[in-house]
Amino acid sequence: MISMTKTVYIKTVGCQMNVLDSEMVIADLKRHGYTVVDTPGEADLLLYNTCSIREQAEEKTYSALGKLKETKARHPEKTIGVMGCMAQKDQETIFRRAPFVDMVVGPGQLHAIPDMLTKVTSGEGRQMAVSLGRKDGKQTVVARSHETFDPLRDPTMRPTPFQAYLRIQIGCDKFCTYCVVPNTRGPEQGRSPEEIVSEARVLAEQGALEITLLGQTVNSYRHRGPDGETDMAGLLERLHDIDGLKRIKFVTNYPKDMTARLLETIRDLPKVSPYLHVPAQSGSDAVLKRMKRGYTIADYMEMFERIETVLPEASVSSDFIVGFCGETDEDFQKSVKLIERCRFKNSFIFQYSVREGTKAAANLIDDVPREVKAARNNELLAVQDRISKEDNQKLIGDTVEVLVEGPSKKADKSDLDAPIVQMTGRTICDRIVVFDGNRRQAGQLMDIQIDDVSSHTLIGRVKTVEVVSLGMPGLAPSS
């Protein structure tokens, strides 16, 4: 049994799925007597929840681990663990590169951490728990090795008490040639709608006003149960009825599964956010084919025009990879044109990074020079920033409803007792809004009038309601 006086520090990088995983790991560790601390120096257990989507993210993790070598030498009683996608991908490599690490835990084995800790602290040596690889057995067997322990939750680990992530799907079966996720997260599996709705009710009871549904291709969600099949639209309809929830968001979407039925459901359910993150990755059919994305630009535009028709108020964002294998200047300019046509709310733009274990690493040549990747990255960012600012400027003078998240990063550095600080929040379309207010407004839905904008932020003020005195019957106005 784990001692009841242990402390844990956790560092999380990567996607929202990792943030949720960290919340659940901490909830589990608290049940075993651990308390959370803010710095590595205070901790008996140091956990690093890692990302493998790009090489840079992995190298940053190895660099952070390297800084712990002396700490471990001075304090051998401390336990160091690496969890998440890099743990599943690199496995024994982590022990070779950082031999002072005690535990390596893949994202499908996080429930094993307490038992692994018991073994480490009782002198049984280094521990590793990872899921089966795609070729290590039948898909059903491999899928079972990628377990989650939803809905084990800890509200104190969330970015705010009134916003929560809810996993509805794990894994991915798309096998894009550049991506490690099908290997690190395993086969695509949808949780049962009953589990999801039950967990959402718990989150609402804990004070969550907004939930964000998570999946690698979240709009592909399907679950077949004894009462038939539930798709994403059907799930949203069930979640919409939960008392206390004000907003429902979901990320990330796959273009070919953005159906008319789903869009009509979003349109007809007021709580569901019309913010749609639908990665295009490239504007070139040739590049998309090498990426094995499963659609053409004509397919993407058919989907986009469907959004414009059914849900004209939607804000759509995208992802782009620049410098993918064989990308020419002409290919790249097609990505520029796609952004200019679609006028995305924002785009997450990345330089291609070779990932060991992917089809691209095995079969394609990383032939775009690093400096060309950087130049294309900067150019595409500039185009997107210009478009984002132009479209944000159209909102000046409008009033938007904002879920106030708390003090902005700027305000965090200001006097904690200041009566007025810069607050931040988001609209239902996921636009960031800042305004002067006070800390008590966190968790409220407020009307904010927009006075100014940047590419990424709306700047406003709390809308005041004018009170007009009509006088009282029988009373003459004072002179």
From Swiss-Prot:
[4Fe-4S] cluster 1 binds at residues 15, 51, 85. It is found in: Cytoplasm. Its EC number is 2.8.4.3. GO terms for biological process: tRNA methylthiolation. It catalyses: N(6)-dimethylallyladenosine(37) in tRNA + (sulfur carrier)-SH + AH2 + 2 S-adenosyl-L-methionine = 2-methylsulfanyl-N(6)-dimethylallyladenosine(37) in tRNA + (sulfur carrier)-H + 5'-deoxyadenosine + L-methionine + A + S-adenosyl-L-homocysteine + 2 H(+). Residues 158-390 form the Radical SAM core domain. Its cofactor is [4Fe-4S] cluster. InterPro entries: Elp3/MiaA/NifB-like_rSAM, Methylthiotransferase, Methylthiotransferase_CS, Methylthiotransferase_N, Methylthiotransferase_N_sf, MiaB_methiolase, rSAM, rSAM_horseshoe. Keywords: 4Fe-4S, Cytoplasm, Iron, Iron-sulfur, Metal-binding, S-adenosyl-L-methionine, Transferase, tRNA processing. [4Fe-4S] cluster 2 binds at residues 172, 176, 179. Belongs to the methylthiotransferase family. MiaB subfamily. This is tRNA-2-methylthio-N(6)-dimethylallyladenosine synthase. It comes from Rhodopirellula baltica (strain DSM 10527 / NCIMB 13988 / SH1). The gene is miaB.
